[in-house]
């Protein structure tokens, strides 16, 4: 079964053809450079550019896969969560294509896509722990199957990737923040500043994360956390912030490993491409799986892949399904199964 995946939840306009859930025939992405001068995503600009790009990326996905449009068996599209204007463009385009081609439509949750991304290039037996690190989400979960996912912990405020972007914006390190901070950190002293990390000891929050305190310390309290003789440079700020941001993740992950006795972890989302993070995770001495670097960030291959499995089990989505910008369960509710 050949699935056309469409992803437009934020600023990347993506389309892919994936066969039988894991064979990537094409994977096309257009990133919007127009946001760089604002040091962040401008939703109105993002949605407008999606309307210009979406037909092109779908055409290129079909051409690159060397198939005819009539060979598409299923259309999978991200319908939630994300920027509502961007989502509407993708969902409405997918609906129109579904009607025109008389092919079924399956609407996919963006987070389920990220959780599936490592399975595009790895065969991993369930259960395993999953960590999604992106600009919009920081989620620790237990996966019993592709559609049986229990949220253990989540950020109580900023997402990990969001904190990177905000620090980079404040110190004019460039956008997107994650890759630029990683590059600057290479030539910095990671111990120049002892920025705080937040660990929750209450039972109901033992797997949760928080980045607001670290962000505040890094932006407003540099002198307070500066070590003696350390210089205040962007390289040192980046290195020290990056170290604290990832140390923030380690204790909740260790607790989840101990409590579940699961020693397999997948990490996905844009932040998963960070090589410093990967070195830190190695110290956990467990099986760890990542998507390829180009599948860590938003992409349509992960949407097509999970779309194939969801369609086989649950059938097509209603053509009346609408885009949904927020899913409160991700932010506020733990123990919920997706």
From Swiss-Prot:
Positions annotated to bind substrate: 132-136, 165, 178, 274
Disulphide connectivity of cysteines: none
Cofactor(s) demanded: Fe(2+)
Matches recorded under InterPro entries: ATPase_NBD, Gcp-like_dom, KAE1/TsaD, Peptidase_M22_CS, TsaD
Binding locations of Fe cation: 110, 114, 298
Localization: Cytoplasm
Keyword line: Acyltransferase, Cytoplasm, Iron, Metal-binding, Transferase, tRNA processing
Free-text remark on how the cofactor is bound: Binds 1 Fe(2+) ion per subunit.
Source organism, top-level taxon: Bacteria
GO terms, molecular function: iron ion binding; N(6)-L-threonylcarbamoyladenine synthase activity
Location (main, coarse): cytoplasm
Catalysed reactions listed for this entry: L-threonylcarbamoyladenylate + adenosine(37) in tRNA = N(6)-L-threonylcarbamoyladenosine(37) in tRNA + AMP + H(+)
EC number(s) from the headed UniProt entry: 2.3.1.234
GO biological process: tRNA threonylcarbamoyladenosine modification
GO cellular component term, pick one: cytoplasm
Pfam families on file: TsaD
HAMAP family hit by this protein: TsaD
Reported function: Required for the formation of a threonylcarbamoyl group on adenosine at position 37 (t(6)A37) in tRNAs that read codons beginning with adenine. Is involved in the transfer of the threonylcarbamoyl moiety of threonylcarbamoyl-AMP (TC-AMP) to the N6 group of A37, together with TsaE and TsaB. TsaD likely plays a direct catalytic role in this reaction.
Protein name (database record): tRNA N6-adenosine threonylcarbamoyltransferase
Organism: Borrelia recurrentis (strain A1)
Higher taxonomy: Bacteria, Pseudomonadati, Spirochaetota, Spirochaetia, Spirochaetales
Gene of this entry: tsaD
């Amino acid at each position: 079964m050949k699935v056309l995946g469409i992803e437009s939840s934020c600023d990347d306009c993506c389309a892919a053809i994936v066969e039988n859930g894991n064979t990537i025939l094409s994977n096309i992405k257009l990133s919007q450079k127009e946001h760089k001068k604002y040091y962040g995503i401008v939703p109105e600009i993002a949605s407008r550019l999606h309307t210009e790009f979406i037909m092109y990326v779908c055409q290129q996905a079909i051409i690159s896969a060397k198939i005819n449009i009539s060979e598409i068996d299923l259309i999978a599209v991200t319908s939630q969560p994300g920027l509502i204007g961007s989502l509407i463009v993708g969902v409405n385009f997918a609906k129109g294509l579904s009607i025109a081609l008389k092919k079924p439509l399956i609407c996919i949750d963006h987070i389920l896509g990220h959780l599936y991304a490592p399975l595009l290039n790895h065969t991993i037996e369930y259960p395993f722990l999953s960590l999604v690190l992106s600009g919009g989400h920081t989620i620790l979960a237990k996966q019993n199957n592709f559609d049986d996912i229990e949220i253990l912990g989540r950020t109580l405020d900023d997402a990990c990737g969001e904190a990177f972007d905000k620090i980079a914006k404040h110190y004019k390190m460039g956008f997107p923040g994650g890759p630029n901070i990683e590059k600057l950190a290479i030539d910095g002293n990671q111990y120049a500043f002892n920025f705080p990390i937040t660990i929750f000891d209450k039972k109901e929050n033992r797997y949760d994360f928080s980045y607001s305190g670290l962000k505040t310390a890094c932006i407003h309290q540099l002198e307070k956390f500066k070590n003696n003789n350390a210089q205040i440079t962007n390289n040192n700020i980046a290195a020290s912030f990056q170290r604290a941001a990832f140390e923030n993740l380690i204790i909740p992950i260790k607790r989840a490993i101990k409590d579940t006795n699961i020693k397999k972890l997948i990490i996905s989302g844009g932040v998963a491409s960070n090589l410093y993070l990967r070195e830190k995770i190695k110290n956990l001495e467990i099986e760890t799986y990542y998507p390829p670097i180009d599948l860590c960030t938003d992409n349509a291959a992960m949407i097509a892949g999970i779309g194939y499995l969801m369609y086989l089990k649950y059938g097509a989505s209603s053509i009346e399904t609408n885009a949904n910008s927020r899913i409160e369960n991700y932010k506020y509710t733990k123990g919920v199964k997706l």
